[in-house]
A protein has these predicted regions:
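A short linear-motif detector with a strong N-terminal bias
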Residues: 17-20, 59-63, 138-144
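Functionally engaged cysteine thiol sites
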Residues: 47, 61-63, 167, 201
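Eukaryotic intrinsically disordered and solvent-exposed regulatory patches
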Residues: 2-5, 25-26, 66-70, 145-151
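Short alpha-helical linear motifs
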Residues: 56-59, 118-119
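Short, flexible, basic/aromatic active-site loop/helix in glycosyltransferases
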Residues: 58-72
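Catalytic core and acceptor-binding pocket of nucleotide-sugar-dependent glycosyltransferases
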Residues: 72-201
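GT-A fold catalytic core of metal-dependent nucleotide-sugar glycosyltransferases
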Residues: 1-56, 76, 81-84, 88
C-alpha cells in the first residue's frame, strides 16, 4: 500500500519525503536535501565504508594469473526515510516494488534495495534511478548515534537533522531521550542506554 500511495503522489508531479514514525526530527529536513538525484535515501551504514561504499576482494587461487577480482558493497538504504523526485524513473521504481510485493513474501526494504541497486539484465528491467545517500551524521540511524556520536565531546558532535531509531527495540524511550538531548538541552538524556540492545554494550 505504501508504494502505491507514493506512486500516486509522483504521478501528480509531487516530490515526496517519506519518514517512518520512529524518527526524531531535529532540524527541517527540506533545508538539507540536495535534490540532484532520483532517490535520496538514509543508509543503515554506520561509517563511511558501510554507508557510502567499498571495494572488496575475491581470491580464487585456482584461477592462477586472474585469481584476484573485485566487487563493490555497501549496507542497505533504509525504506523508512527517503526523498523521491517525481519523474518516470521513480514512478517505475514504485511500480516495480509494489508489483513484486503483491506476488512475493518479501521484506519491502529488501525489494526496495534490489530494485534500486541490482542491475538490469536479460528480461529483468530495473527503473535505473540515480541515487544519493544521505549523510549519516545528518540523517542518523540509531546505531550511529548510540555507538559513536554520543561518545564524542559535545562540542564535536554533529547536530543531526533526523534520527531514526531503527537499530533498537526500545524505540519510544530512545526517541524521548533524543528529544530531551537535542531539543531540550538535557546533557544526560542518552547516557542510560546501552550502545546496542544488550546491557554493557
Amino acid at each position: 500500500m505504501k508504494y502505491e500511495i507514493l506512486e500516486e503522489f509522483l504521478q501528480l508531479g509531487w516530490n515526496v519525503l517519506l519518514s517512518d514514525v520512529d524518527i526524531v526530527t531535529v532540524q527541517d529536513p527540506m533545508d538539507f536535501l540536495h535534490r540532484d538525484s532520483d532517490v535520496e535515501g538514509m543508509s543503515d551504514g554506520y561509517d563511511d565504508l558501510t554507508a557510502y561504499g567499498a571495494i572488496y576482494g575475491v581470491d580464487d587461487e585456482s584461477m592462477g594469473w586472474s585469481r584476484y577480482a573485485q566487487g563493490t558493497q555497501h549496507m542497505a538504504l533504509n525504506s523508512g526515510l527517503f526523498y523521491l523526485k517525481a519523474n518516470e524513473r521513480t514512478i517505475a521504481l514504485m511500480q516495480n516494488i509494489y508489483k513484486r510485493l503483491r506476488k512475493e513474501n518479501a521484506w519491502d526494504q529488501s525489494v526496495y534495495n534490489e530494485e534500486i541497486f541490482f542491475l538490469t539484465h536479460g528480461p529483468v528491467k530495473r527503473a535505473q534511478v540515480s541515487v544519493r545517500v544521505m549523510e549519516i551524521e545528518k540523517f542518523m540511524n540509531s546505531k550511529v548515534l548510540f555507538k559513536r556520536i554520543r561518545k564524542l565531546p559535545r562540542s564535536r558532535q554533529p547536530l543531526p537533522v533526523m534520527v531514526h531509531m531503527n537499530f533498537h527495540p526500545d524505540k519510544t524511550e530512545r526517541m524521548e531521550a533524543a528529544i530531551r538531548y537535542y531539543l531540550k538541552g538535557d546533557q544526560d538524556a542518552l547516557k542510560r542506554f546501552p550502545g546496542g540492545s544488550e546491557p554493557g554494550t
